[in-house]
Swiss-Prot record:
Subcellular location: Secreted
Name used for this protein in its record: Probable beta-glucosidase A
Protein's job: Beta-glucosidases are one of a number of cellulolytic enzymes involved in the degradation of cellulosic biomass. Catalyzes the last step releasing glucose from the inhibitory cellobiose.
Glycosylation site list: 71, 222, 263, 326, 333, 365, 453, 534, 553, 575, 679, 725
Active site location: 291
Length: 873
């Protein structure tokens, strides 16, 4: 007897074919992209730094019953326990409460007395590995102190294909190398604090439109399947998979699969992306969890590589689950092999031990669902004990300092005609624009920050946190001006243009604040369904700038935004004497900005994306209307690797501000480029060969009678259990299609536990170890040629030489401090991966014979140093 309805959606989507991308127009009868299957799901083996944690995981999982293993894999249901996602427990073996997973990538969501950190895009603007690590460490400390086991971040999906994508701010940058480095450092910081980090959203999750059927239908779109992101193999490896390889190499404990389909197979049951790319090729040793309600099948997802279902129920609070009881049944009847569930549990516990949860763990001391001190143990159904659910533990420590430092270090000075830094002697200062002031409803007045009222320091969605306070620009500037004996006049109503004109005409300097917001698709703000409708400024921003500029010849524009905005109509106006992009700086917004405005911090930030003249400058538009009848909308990534600055370079289009651009209060010079091959007998590339060991199993399965609900157990309504109502498995499964034959839905090889061949590009966490061998050393001299001490960000780009390759691709960067007149030699190395392309035929990384060059400078378009690279293979 076998399952039917729980897996059919997965297996019809994962048909056998080569992954391809077709044109943009799709009809119901047109051939669509497919995702080739890859089975069986690789079993973890504790490679490298994972060995000890894996050994300990095997020891405890070997003692577990089947139901206990299943309990670790399945959430208990939405709002059933204190965290946004919480697994079942194994109290018999000391796991006395379920593993707690909690948003977000910038702080603890649904909590209090926590910090609100700068967004990922701000971290990218710092180009600083240490600051990325310290932010991760500080966040990890706060999550740990609240009793959270799994931090649901950071994000590298979306990468940033679309500048108007709703959640690009949660990630870092559209450049995979910049994202990969800062992604990895954030993960190291989180996990060094003893909390499991989650690399998300894996993969190709580049827009909000059509990510979920119910959400899209709520907006009036007639679709029956979620969007499919269609990508070719080369683009997948060289662009979107790149930062996830860095995450796996950094030891990330969890990966969250995304809502979208990839080549018409759902992200959480896509055997190509989960089994092959993530587990076999990248050697991922942790566990894959679903995004919330991104789980679409039972057996299909289990065989395709999913390890944890979140939040456990199929739809929020419906009491149904693809796993839980159904996963127990599927093992008992042989549909899912025992080794697959053993591997799920081992992967979860390996991550648990690797970060030290067994030493640091405390119960969650907050409730995601209420700020009341007392409440029901199981909030959704008002059942269980009436107990203390919020202990109001202050976890902020001294993290405001690192938040303020990152805020200043991420403030990009795009333009400066001598207006900055301010001297403090300005007598009359105008502060103009709603974005300077407070949200009249309070900093947390809009649930999940789902509005654009007052200054923008955080965008909207599940990737948010409650502010403990928010220092607005108006407050910080007023404090600064008053302390220097000046006068400050603020108008923070964007409709009060005549009043703004009056203030601007009397001010020696006018600071204008404008913004543009976006977020997750379940919230619609002013017709923006997560994704932005356009790249214009919000809340009458252009009119505010026009008004002030026409009345003040010293206008400084400050932009808080989730990404690029259109500035072409005013950026070169001579009365606009400076432009600042401050991103989403978090709770210390005003303080960090004032540090830069008044010169206490010399700006060193570089824009992590390109500022184009029009939306069309960025290439293909975001898919905002269904294009495949009522089936899955098809988003074809026909641009390949050419996004952001790579696209501008290909088109020979000059942007307003190029990727990597950012001014300082001093100047820097570049000289003395040196390139040296690092020849050694061990530098030859060695494709991985051999095979795995057989799939191990741990403990005994038992019989159905072993997993019946105990007599006298008071079951919680809609709570997801791993237990059975009956020894009749069909009755326990409640599956109307129970009885299908294996041949109808089980992919070939999916249950094969015999030794499997290793992939050439695999062999260790992050991929083939020889990919990371250094082949070339590059050095350059950086000189502070000005009169102010400051940081510079040297950037190294490589021309890979092929006729269809980008002009340059970023490969290395740093942030170095230089006193006036000081010189430093910056030295870095290029490894094999930095110089290679993905060969779709060989299914491996290859350094082509095309001549290659190295370029060093201060941005993607300011590269004064260049030299040929020695031929290395």
């Amino acid at each position: 007897m076998r399952f039917g309805w729980l897996e059919v959606a997965a297996l019809t989507a994962a048909s056998v074919a080569n992954a391809q991308v077709f044109d943009d127009s799709h009809g119901n009868n047109q051939e669509l992209a497919f995702s080739p299957p890859f089975y069986p799901s690789p079993w973890a083996d504790g490679q490298g730094e994972w060995a000890d944690a894996h050994r300990r995981a095997v020891e405890i999982v070997s003692q577990m019953t089947l139901a206990e293993k299943v309990n670790l894999t399945t959430g208990t249901g939405w709002e059933m326990d204190r965290c946004v996602g919480q697994t079942g427990s194994v109290p018999r073996l000391g796991i006395n409460w379920g593993l707690c997973g909690q948003d977000s990538p910038l702080g603890i969501r649904f909590s209090d007395l926590n910090s609100a950190f700068p967004a990922g895009t701000n971290v990218a603007a710092t180009w600083d590995k240490t600051l990325a690590y310290l932010r991760g460490k500080a966040m990890g400390e706060e999550f740990n102190d609240k009793g959270v086991d799994i931090l649901l971040g950071p994000a590298a999906g979306p990468l940033g294909k679309y500048p108007d994508g709703g959640r690009i701010w949660e990630g870092f940058s559209p450049d995979p190398a910049l994202t990969g480095v800062l992604f990895a450092e954030t993960i190291r910081g989180i996990q060094d604090a003893g909390v499991i980090a989650t690399a998300k959203h894996y993969i190709m999750n580049e827009q909000e439109h059509f990510r979920q059927v119910s959400e899209a239908q709520g907006y009036g779109y007639n679709i029956t399947e979620t969007l499919s992101s269609n990508v070719d193999d080369k683009t997948m490896h060289e662009l979107y998979l790149w930062p996830f390889a860095d995450a796996v190499r950094a030891g990330v404990g969890a990966v969250m699969c995304s809502y979208n389909q990839i080549n018409n197979s759902y992200g959480c049951q896509n055997s190509q992306t989960l089994n092959k790319l993530l587990k076999a090729e990248l050697g991922f040793q942790g566990f894959v969890m679903s995004d919330w309600s991104a789980h679409h099948s039972g057996v299909g997802s289990a065989l395709a590589g999913l390890d944890m279902s979140m939040p456990g129920d199929i739809s929020f609070d419906d009491g149904l689950s693809f796993w839980g009881t159904n996963l127990t049944v599927s093992v008992l009847n042989g549909t899912v092999p025992a080794w697959r569930v053993d591997d799920m549990a081992v992967r979860i516990m390996t991550a648990y031990y690797k970060v030290g949860r067994d030493r640091l763990r405390i119960p969650p001391n907050f409730s995601s669902w209420t700020r009341d001190e007392y409440g029901w143990e199981h909030f959704a159904v008002s059942e269980g004990a009436w107990t203390k659910v919020n202990d109001f533990v202050n976890v902020q420590r001294s993290h405001s300092q690192i938040i303020r430092e990152i805020g200043a270090a991420s403030t990009v000075l795009l333009k400066n005609k001598g207006a900055l830094p301010l001297t403090g002697k300005e007598v009359k200062v105008g502060v103009l624009g709603e974005d300077a002031g407070s949200n009249p409803w309070g900093a947390n007045g809009c649930p999940d920050r789902g509005c654009d009222n007052g200054t923008l320091a955080m965008a909207w969605g599940s990737g948010t946190a409650n502010f403990p306070y928010l220092v607005t620009p108006e407050q910080a500037i007023q404090r600064e001006v008053i302390s220097n004996g000046g006068n400050v006049f603020a108008v923070t109503d964007n409709g009060a243009l005549s009043q703004m004109a009056d203030v601007a005409s009397q001010s020696s300097v006018s600071l204008v604040f404008v913004n543009a917001d976006s977020g997750e698709g379940y919230i619609n703000v002013d017709g923006n369904e997560g994704d932005r409708k356009n790249l214009t400024l919000w809340k009458n921003g252009e009119a505010v700038i026009d008004t002030v500029v026409s009345h003040c010849n010293n206008t400084i524009v400050v932009i808080h935004s989730v990404g690029p905005v259109l500035i072409d109509r005013w950026y070169d106006n001579p009365n606009v004497t400076a432009i600042i992009w401050a991103g989403l700086p978090g709770q210390e917004s005003g303080n960090s900005l004032v540090d830069v405005l008044y010169g206490r911090v010399n700006p060193s930030a570089k824009t992590p994306f390109t500022w184009g003249k029009t939306r069309k400058s960025y290439g293909a538009p975001l898919l905002s209307e269904p294009n495949n009848g009522n089936g899955a909308p098809q988003d074809d990534f026909n641009e390949g690797v050419f996004i952001d600055y790579r696209h501008f370079d290909k088109r020979n289009e000059t942007p307003i501000y190029e990727f990597g651009h950012g001014l300082s209060y001093t100047t820097f010079g570049y000289s003395h480029l040196r390139v040296q091959a690092l020849n050694s007998s061990s530098s030859a590339y060695v494709p991985t060969s051999g095979e795995t060991k057989p799939a191990p199993t741990y403990g005994e399965i038992g019989s159905a009678a072993d997993y019946l609900y105990p007599e006298g157990l008071k079951r919680i309504t809609k709570f997801i259990y791993p237990l059975l109502n009956s020894t009749d498995l069909e009755d326990s499964s409640d599956d109307p299609n129970y009885g299908w034959e294996d041949s109808e839905y089980i992919p070939e090889g999916a249950r094969d536990g015999s030794p499997q061949p290793l992939l050439k590009a695999g062999g260790a966490p992050g991929g083939n170890p020889t990919l990371y061998q250094d082949l070339v050393r590059v050095s350059a001299t950086i000189t502070n040629t000005g009169n102010v001490a400051g940081y510079e960000v040297p950037q190294l780009y490589v021309s890979l030489g092929g006729p269809n390759e980008p002009r340059v691709v970023l490969r290395k960067f740093d942030r170095i401090f230089l006193a006036p007149g000081e010189q430093k030699v910056w030295t870095t190395t290029l490894n094999r991966r930095d110089l290679a392309n993905w060969d779709v035929e060989a299914q491996d990384w290859v350094i082509t014979k095309h001549p290659k060059k190295v370029h060093v400078g201060s941005s993607s378009r300011k590269l004064p140093l260049r030299a040929p690279l020695p031929r290395v293979y």
